[in-house]
């Protein structure tokens, strides 16, 4: 195992736990998100990077795995979390909105929010370079 290689992998740290992340930093990547994936490692996720804070709303259309959706403001403080967002394969999928302006959105496997014991104000560390 290459420790130096792991250090260079894009990752985030939340409540002391490290998650390797895919980066959604374009509209196309954000629209695709985690659609059509059948599984995701327990220490993996996806980070959505937006140019500024705004009210965010995600849906689970064509997403095959349940997720926790974490919304962070421009200071990387947790604004809100939608726990256990369910997969949706129909036309009318539920939306999961932030409760306040968010600039960063993190998707992890469902159950991580409860496992980590996250609370509003928790800080996300970004290591994307």
Task: Describe the function of each predicted region.
Residues 1-3:
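Bacterial N-terminal signal peptides
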């Amino acid at each position: 195992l290459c420790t130096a290689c792991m250090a260079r992998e894009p990752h985030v740290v939340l409540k002391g736990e490290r998650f390797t992340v895919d980066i959604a930093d374009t509209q196309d990547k954000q629209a695709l998100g985690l659609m059509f994936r059948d599984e995701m490692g327990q220490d993996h996720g996806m980070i959505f990077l937006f140019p500024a804070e705004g009210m965010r709303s995600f849906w689970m259309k064509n997403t095959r795995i349940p997720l926790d959706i974490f919304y962070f403001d421009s200071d990387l403080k947790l604004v809100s979390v939608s726990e256990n967002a369910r997969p949706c394969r129909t036309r009318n999928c539920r939306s999961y909105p932030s409760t306040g302006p968010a600039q960063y959105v993190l998707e992890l496997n469902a159950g991580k929010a409860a496992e980590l014991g996250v609370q509003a104000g928790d800080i996300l560390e970004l290591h994307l370079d």
